[in-house]
Amino acid sequence: MKAASDPVIAVLNEVVGTSSVGAMVREALRRVLQQLETSAGQMAWEIIPLTAFGSSLPESIRSCWVFVIRAGAETGAERHPNSHQRSLSLTGSGIFELRGPDGWTPHPLVSTGSDATEQGWVTIPPATWHRLSVSPQAWGMLSFHTVAPEELIEERPVDPNDLDGETHQERYAGRR
């Protein structure tokens, strides 16, 4: 599905564009960038309480995260078997690749600050393999999920070359 045809993204884009939400997201992004700078990890994140959005989020949204991934990083394949993910590029750029029946499809994302939905957003249905390649600048994103933070599962292949083989699952919340 293209981001522009996802009705949930249309609502999220409007919510994120409000000045109060924008200020809160920028502050969270600043904290997560600092967290990444002081760690050795490939990425850092912070969970944004849904109360920060008031009552304007679609009912299906159960968690929101700010992620920052190191410059030049390649994340490898992962998927969330229990959540539909929608991500907005906040700073930097990169390529979100989604795995479909015909192989990997690239979705280049940039942080335009404009209303260009296809350039800034990606929609990832549950259990869809995805991987990221980050530009030479750290890439900050806002990700919305359809499960609560403590329920979000990251699944990775045991053998990166065999996406149909055995996988390893881990919950994001509580891990660092």
Locate the predicted segments by residue.
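A short, N-terminal "cap"/entry segment at the start of jelly-roll beta-barrel domains
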Residues: 1-61, 112-114, 176
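Double-stranded beta-helix
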Residues: 1-2, 100-117, 129-176
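Short histidine-centered beta-strand/loop micro-motifs
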Residues: 54-58, 75-81, 87-88, 133-134
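Short, charged/polar surface micro-motifs in flexible loops or helix N-caps
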Residues: 60-62, 70-74, 93-95, 102-103
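Ordered hydrophobic segments in well-structured contexts
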Residues: 64-69, 86-89, 95, 140-143
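Conserved short histidine dyad/triad with adjacent acidic residue
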Residues: 65-86, 124
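Glycine- and acidic-residue-biased ligand/ion/polar-headgroup-sensing regions
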Residues: 81-103
